[in-house]
Amino acid sequence: MKNVKFIKKSESVIGLWLPILVILILFAFLVAESVIMKDIILSNSVVALATAIMASAALVTILVSNRQVQLMARQQRLKAIEDRLEKFYIPLIKAFSSYVYTAQTEDEIETIITCRRYLAGNNLLRVLPMHFKFKADKIAGSANWTFYAKEDFEQWKEALDVLWEEFLEVLKEYYTLSGTEISLPEKPDWLIGYK
């Protein structure tokens, strides 16, 4: 039992060589049928037929493999876009456009800004602050996020506008890759202020 090696499906002989085996069996069937019917086939034409069958089989295999690689690359790209949307853009947009404020919201924003910056686009990285400095204003009907300095407020206002533009670009790319009809949301009002 110590030397038992478990074979993955992709490594199995049948899974790997099945298309080639099918083509060889079809070729053998064609040759056998020709011999049984006592057709006169010159050895050159058998070689030419075998070469043509193998070439067409190789072409079909290449086309199918290429299509599978394209589909896998598309799925990987869709997954990367979903991660960008779900882990970066959507949480930040919700945090700055929702009246819902919890004690964890500030920590979530700080975590997104510091730890998930790699998910942001280049334009946003140029204007996105390294940390989230604000003063929580809990007065009903006022903005959730009130900034101490006017410079911070202006920087965040610009960063949120760039965030929204990049979000729309990423969302359009996602819709295009997934083949879904493009339906873009309206830009929210940013709940930020300056005192």
From Swiss-Prot:
The chain crosses the membrane at residues 13-32, 42-64. Keywords: Cell membrane, Membrane, Transmembrane, Transmembrane helix. Disulfide bonds: none annotated. GO terms for cellular component: plasma membrane. It is a multi-pass membrane protein. Pfam families: AF_0924. It is found in: Cell membrane. Its main location: membrane. This is Uncharacterized protein AF_0924. It comes from Archaeoglobus fulgidus (strain ATCC 49558 / DSM 4304 / JCM 9628 / NBRC 100126 / VC-16).
